[in-house]
Amino acid sequence: MALKCGIVGLPNVGKSTLFNCLSSAKAQAANFPFCTIEPNVGVITVPDERLTRLAELVHPGRIVPATCEIVDIAGLVKGASKGEGLGNKFLGNIRETDAIIHVLRCFEDENITHVDGTIDPIRDKEIIDTELQLKDLETIESQLAKVQKTAAAGNKDAKVLAGVLMAYKEVLEQGKNARVVTFDSKEEQDAARNLFLLTSKPVLYVCNVSEAEAKDGNEFTKKIEAMAADEGAEAMVIAAKTEEDIAELESYEDKQLFLEEFGLEESGVNRLIKKAYALLNLQTFITAGEMEVKAWTYKKGWKAPQCAGVIHTDFEKGFIRAEVIKYDDYIQYGSEAAVREAGKMGIEGKDYVVQDGDIMHFRFNV
């Protein structure tokens, strides 16, 4: 299950700098691989110190982290929803992503011009929001035209869909994003999910600040954080220029020293990837053996058979049981055999809800 995030933002906000830093993040993840699929698409590893700790005990042939696909989505201008600039391509690329990383300029620099002449991240956010909302309204109105007659004739599914469409239409016409709407019934939730609205996607607002403000942010970032909370989104502070400097350093030790100088415990890039992962309610279970220590991505709340299916569909179909070791127990006892001997290995059935960091071994029969 690969996570796909799209990075968006107006020109000169630091979007491409941030993407380039993400492209260089291989050096911060113990030389895990980074590859470029297209010039604007990269696959990057999800930082997870647990894999390194386990590898020190297991001595596997390789370490395989979870991955995240990052797409640098072409900049847009006002009128993108009507196809101006790179509008149609921009909006099409966003539709294919699971989550949006929205970079906002929260720094002053007279050498870097702003497309609108002044620094105002709230205004910048609203420009992109408006384009996405207009495109969503277009989708809603097109669907409504098709479904209203069927709903009026008494079709139950059409009635549910029409109700969902009208709820979205109301908030979008108020200049709000679709993600603020919630539905109670499973039928409504399914209908909403199948619309693939742009403004219903989870969003992480990334406040790009100066190096001096990397730790505590500024007045701009406080406004963005408050606004994000109001719409059920996430926000974080990052200094793309600082991240660019970190990316140029060769060793892990040099990077850590650099971070300490700025009073930072972890690079902004690492924090960003982890936040994006959490944004989609994704978690990690681990398999550990002589061949490899590997992270597997699953949705929070999934049960053991569903997680087995992440490895192979046959594992889910023929699921018998799962042998589960808690990460802390593995670290404490030092090996699978020692965990067994201490009676700390759990034998779980099909109703077991997998927890983040569980070390799993699945028994199945095909």
State what each model feature region is.
Residues F34, D48-L51, V64-I70, E84-D98, ...:
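Amphipathic alpha-helical transducer elements in NTP-driven molecular machines
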Residues S24-A25, R50-L51, G75-V77, R105-N111, ...:
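Conserved nucleotide-binding/hydrolysis micro-motifs of P-loop NTPases
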